[in-house]
Amino acid sequence: MSKGYELQVSELNLVSIPIFCMMLFMISQISWADEVEYVRIPSGHLQSNLNDPSGQSMGVLMAAFEMRSRPVTQQEFDSFLWAQPQWNKKQISPLMATSDYLADHDGAAEEVMTHVSWFAARAYCHYEHARLPTWFEWEYVAAADTWQKDARTDAGRNQGILTALQERLHRKGYVGQHLPNSYGIYDMNSLIWEWVEDFAAMFPQPDARDSSSAASLALCGGSALAFHDRGQFALMMRVAALSSLRPDQSSSFVGFRCVRSLEGSR
């Protein structure tokens, strides 16, 4: 074999290796998205803790849907950033994130993903063939404890949530460290606050945000700060936290999980 031919083969291999690696990564991402655990949440009725404009608690008929069993982790978000580099800190549009986006991000396998904007959370869920939950979907599942589908009147449970959130202030958050609720969903109340699709409904004033921004969603203007049960202090804290953020902002205590609609479900 001539040296010239050997050189061509060597150059070809150097070109082929990254292409081959890219193909392997793309295949792994397809299987990874399919393997993420989603749990079916049955249809039912939610008596929301949010009041309607007349001051009455809102009753909502919930269609069945699927919810991610755990919040998104840093490692999972790293895979998304690899596949969608426009969401990396150095490349993301300043309209989509502020300077603290991806702060303290080290890609840990079981550490919950925080410091992510609403825009980026939505993009991630789309990447996972899913979407962010609505507030009512989130509240519906979060009402459960390990044994009951609706444990919101349990004073001990509510105090336990507050205690867990206070302890979280002094440590990093790792997913799946406690028992799941009765639906099989982990970390709904005690680990982080979570983005929801219609978080703009948390604004107490209809003009609290620029009406031209993506925060002006269908439910914007509903006074979600009017709570039916003031004993739900942990839930009120969550609403207050989300209402204080713009969709481009992030926080060390706000992460997210995704849901999937079920075709034909009512």
Feature roles, as predicted:
Residues D100, D104-G107, T114-V239, P247:
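Functional-site microenvironments in short loops/helix caps that host divalent-cation chemistry
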Residues V72, D198-A200, E263-G264:
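Acidic glycine-/aspartate-rich tracts in secreted/extracellular proteins
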Residues S250-R266:
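Short, structured beta-strand segments at or near domain termini in extracellular proteins/domains
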Residues D34-L95, H115-S117, S190:
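A short glycine-rich, aromatic-capped structural motif
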Residues I30-W32:
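Sec/Tat signal peptide C-region and signal peptidase I cleavage site
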Residues D52-Q56, A241-P247:
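Short, P/G- and charge-enriched loop/turn segments at secondary-structure junctions
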Residues S16-I27:
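Bacterial N-terminal signal peptides
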Residues M1-L14:
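N-terminal secretory signal peptides that target proteins for export/translocation
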